[in-house]
Amino acid sequence: MTSLLLFGASEGGLFDFDATLPLMAAQVVLLTFILNALFFKPVGRVVEDREDYVLTSRAEAKKKLAEVEKLENDLKNQLKEARKAAQQVISEAEEDSEKLYKEALNLANSEANASREQARREIDSQRDSALKKLKSDSDKLGDLIVERLLAAK
């Protein structure tokens, strides 16, 4: 120990309890308050603002997604109804065209039958007229033959 005093070394060493330890503790506390005021609070505020923004954005996105799904369902229903109405219009048009086709076919058949009947009546009339004329001519010819035979005797 005497040698330590000769060289001017102080006693204690690592665990000296002098004014530096409380001074260091005060510096740590002061630095903690300064860092808290200058760094941690603003960063915490930014993180909280960002979290609020993300939560708000997610809520708005969910709301918009629900709106889009509702609109999609509405449009699907409208499309389904429009297809159904179009199919009904098509089937009604097909029925109408089939009805018109049948009416036109019946009209054409009745006109053809009427025309055929008219032609048959005209043919019958002409045949009857030809038969009457032929009978008249044959009667005249028969009378002429009888006259010639009687005149020849």
Swiss-Prot record:
Family designation: Belongs to the ATPase B chain family.
One Gene Ontology cellular component: proton-transporting ATP synthase complex
High-level lineage: Bacteria, Bacillati, Cyanobacteriota, Cyanophyceae, Synechococcales
Cited Pfam families: ATP-synt_B (PF00430)
Subunit structure: F-type ATPases have 2 components, F(1) - the catalytic core - and F(0) - the membrane proton channel. F(1) has five subunits: alpha(3), beta(3), gamma(1), delta(1), epsilon(1). F(0) has four main subunits: a(1), b(1), b'(1) and c(10-14). The alpha and beta chains form an alternating ring which encloses part of the gamma chain. F(1) is attached to F(0) by a central stalk formed by the gamma and epsilon chains, while a peripheral stalk is formed by the delta, b and b' chains.
Membrane topology (UniProt): Single-pass membrane protein
InterPro entries referenced in this protein's UniProt entry, alphabetically: ATP_synth_b, ATP_synth_B-like_membr_sf, ATP_synth_b/b'su_bac/chlpt, ATP_synthase_B_chain
Localization per Swiss-Prot or TrEMBL: Cellular thylakoid membrane
Keyword terms of this UniProt record: ATP synthesis, CF(0), Hydrogen ion transport, Ion transport, Membrane, Thylakoid, Transmembrane, Transmembrane helix, Transport
UniProt name for this protein: ATP synthase subunit b'
